[in-house]
Amino acid sequence: MSVSDSLFERAKQLMPGGVNSPVRAFRSVGGAPFFVKAARGATLVTADDQELIDFVCTWGPAIHGHNHPRIKAAIAEALEHGTSFGTPNPYEVEMAELIVRFFPSIQKVRMCNSGTEATMSAIRLARGFTKRSKIIKFAGCYHGHSDSLLIKAGSGALTHGHPDSAGVPISFAQETVVVTYNDRAALEAAFAANVGQIACVIIEPYCGNVGFIMPDAGYLQAVRELCTREGAVLIFDEVMTGFRQARGGVQELENITPDLTCLGKIIGGGLPVGAFGGRTYLMDLLAPLGPVYQAGTLSGNPLAMAAGIAALKLLDEENPYARLDQLGRQLRDAVLAAAKTKGLPVQVPQRGSMFSIFFTPQPVRDYASALAGDAKLFGRFFHTCLANGVYLAPSAYEAAFLSTAHEGAAIDRACEVLASAINEL
């Protein structure tokens, strides 16, 4: 029995499914998960000493690769002063300054501990501001595991065939209106059916939790216009895309100004973190200034702030986005070329350092077209790649990520492995 298998057997006796987040259990692709004991650059080292080129990047945060010396040093320096204070600290002020600098839509920001906390709190703030209760989300988009948002959710909920989670009261579900991504008419119809009742629209501007899906030209602008017309707060969930697609997120690339923005992942440098921010008139409704309550024991944790500050400063200094897009295109082109030779229908939506591989003949532009892909074939593809040293997300419905550490031999080897895996299908 391998070390990973032994650990998994022990874990299953102690944790539900043997994991602390469902997608890690490999239920979508089959087999047992491996355990990781170390990571550096673009490489994971398993408990059995197998080295894997990693395209999960801890589900997005590791844009600089694993164990970056600048981030390690920042954490070590902060650790010299303590792990947590329960008071304001200088690091959270510097982090807020960086976020406000790079996101013009954000005038004030509140730190929290996860993307789920960020989206949950942003929705509460939108409800407090509008004095309305209903929200609109998009089928397949995942915004964390709070009750209001586990309605036709993506990510692990979609992977495991339970887009509507047990334990969510019907009364909660009735407050969430679900529409199709990339369908303006559906959004207009949702507003028309709920006149004066919609507090907010929450959207992944580039979807990453039903696989990677891009918006149609003009779609995000249409969403912005409809929210303005209907008096609803527009929330961009950029937990995944913020600082990954651009320093100012998708809103910078698409020239859209949301009312509230949710952040996470990269801003923690690999440590637990979340944040949400927006215009002063909205943010000042939060306690202690206003009536909308939000709090957290470890919010603004100095270690997470120090790691995140180092990560953001590296992005500012290196501006790696064009380079990351080139790496993404190289990988995409290798897969498409192999699929063409094989005669296999494959879609590889890619922008910057995010991509997905769907085994389907039709372009993927929403939840339904993502589900039309061949998930079983993806599972075979995944395991062939894994056996040859390349780790993709263990689900057909998750985005993959690149880092600056994937340059050179890592990307060349990955292209070879992915092309070969296509040929073996």
UniProtKB/Swiss-Prot annotation:
Modified residues annotated as N6-(pyridoxal phosphate)lysine in this record: K265
GO BP terms, alphabetized: protoporphyrinogen IX biosynthetic process
Location(s) in or outside the cell: Cytoplasm
GO cellular component assignments: cytoplasm
Pathway: Porphyrin-containing compound metabolism; protoporphyrin-IX biosynthesis; 5-aminolevulinate from L-glutamyl-tRNA(Glu): step 2/2
SUPFAM superfamilies in the record: PLP-dependent transferases
Catalysed reaction, written as an equation: (S)-4-amino-5-oxopentanoate = 5-aminolevulinate
Highest taxon of the lineage: Bacteria
GO molecular function: glutamate-1-semialdehyde 2,1-aminomutase activity; pyridoxal phosphate binding; transaminase activity
Keyword list, A-Z: Cytoplasm, Isomerase, Porphyrin biosynthesis, Pyridoxal phosphate
Subunit structure: Homodimer.
PANTHER family the UniProt entry points to: GLUTAMATE-1-SEMIALDEHYDE 2,1-AMINOMUTASE, GLUTAMATE-1-SEMIALDEHYDE 2,1-AMINOMUTASE 1, CHLOROPLASTIC-RELATED
Family, similarity comment: Belongs to the class-III pyridoxal-phosphate-dependent aminotransferase family. HemL subfamily.
Protein name: Glutamate-1-semialdehyde 2,1-aminomutase
Highest classification ranks of the organism: Bacteria, Pseudomonadati, Verrucomicrobiota, Opitutia, Opitutales
